[in-house]
A protein has these predicted regions:
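Flexible, solvent-exposed loop/hinge segments and secondary-structure transition points
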Residues: 2-178
């Protein structure tokens, strides 16, 4: 007498293994290309902030809500001129956090900022990503200009600035491990 449950289980196990192996192979070949495209987007945004040829740029991997941290030093020196943070915070979308690049000069002035990734609601949250939030000094968000009607997205962007503001003094004072 044949055990149909056992046969069905083995068939499902085999299908699962084949699918897992196929997914691993696809990921192996596509992961470098995906990273290359993501890096190209980030470096294009960095080029909007600074003339990259004028600086020695190093990268540090962040933890938690911080992604890559870009350290800009004047060519041939050890003096940090600016730090650009990749930082994330939860907006309206449950699936993806709002990700920003925030460029801060050594005097704590905000050079610029850009939302590089988001999946906020079209017509609402997604429309404010190019908004001027009136942040000129990273440790003073009193003038932060949120947008009415998109509170969660505005709060996510403010959280990104807050996270950078809490961290920047330590990083400029030697807290980064390059």
């Amino acid at each position: 007498m044949k055990n149909n449950g056992l046969v069905s289980g083995l068939v499902l196990l085999t299908i699962g293994l084949v699918c897992g192996i196929l997914l691993s192979v696809v990921n192996y070949f596509t992961a470098p290309k995906i990273k290359e495209v993501e890096d190209a987007i980030k470096y294009a945004a960095l080029e909007e902030f600074y003339t990259l040829a004028n600086y020695d740029i190093s990268e540090v991997s962040g933890e938690g809500d911080f992604g890559t941290i870009f350290i800009f030093k004047e060519k041939g020196t050890e003096t940090i001129n600016a730090i650009v943070y990749t930082v994330r915070a939860q907006g309206y979308s449950d699936s993806t956090k709002v990700e920003m690049l925030i460029a801060v000069n050594s005097d704590l002035t905000v050079e610029d900022y850009k939302v590089v990734s988001q999946q906020e609601t079209t017509g609402f949250g997604a429309d404010i990503v190019d908004n001027d939030f009136n942040v000129s000094v990273i440790d003073d968000l009193s003038g932060f200009d949120s947008v009415s009607g998109v509170t969660k997205t505005s709060n996510a962007i403010k959280t990104c600035f807050t996270l950078v503001g809490e961290r920047i003094a330590s990083d400029l004072g030697g807290g980064l491990n390059e």
